[in-house]
């Protein structure tokens, strides 16, 4: 199964994270399929940069985000776009 999760980068005591698409059997910092953005929790306010189109595409393909990534993607507005796409597909099927 393909997951969307965080991989840790940065120095000791100064983490930042990449949001990546990875096979769930891989290590946390192992090889990944694609990078979707990054998250820096140390900055005030935190920095969140997500390629929304790529994230939507992977979610529609069936990639499961981890709970933390799900919260971050919700803040970035990814799930609103996913819902809109699903609604338009249902409307097209009904007509």
From Swiss-Prot:
Cellular component aspect of the GO annotation: cytoplasm; small ribosomal subunit
Entry-linked PROSITE patterns: RIBOSOMAL_S16 (PS00732)
Keywords of this entry: Ribonucleoprotein, Ribosomal protein
Gene3D superfamilies: 3.30.1320.10
Single Gene Ontology BP annotation: translation
Pfam families: Ribosomal_S16
Superkingdom in the source lineage: Bacteria
GO molecular function (one): structural constituent of ribosome
Record-linked HAMAP family: Ribosomal_bS16 (MF_00385)
NCBIfam families the record matches: S16
Family, per entry: Belongs to the bacterial ribosomal protein bS16 family.
Protein known as: Small ribosomal subunit protein bS16
Species this chain originates from: Thermosipho melanesiensis (strain DSM 12029 / CIP 104789 / BI429)
High-level lineage: Bacteria, Thermotogati, Thermotogota, Thermotogae, Thermotogales
């Amino acid at each position: 199964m393909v997951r969307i999760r965080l991989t840790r980068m940065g120095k000791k005591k100064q983490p930042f994270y990449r949001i990546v698409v990875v096979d769930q059997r891989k290590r946390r910092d192992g090889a990944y399929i694609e990078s979707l953005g990054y998250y820096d929790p140390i900055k005030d306010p935190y920095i969140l940069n997500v390629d929304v189109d790529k994230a939507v595409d992977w979610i529609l393909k069936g990639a499961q985000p981890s709970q933390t990534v799900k919260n971050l993607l919700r803040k970035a507005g990814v799930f609103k776009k996913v819902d809109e796409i699903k609604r338009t597909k249902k409307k097209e099927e009904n007509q």
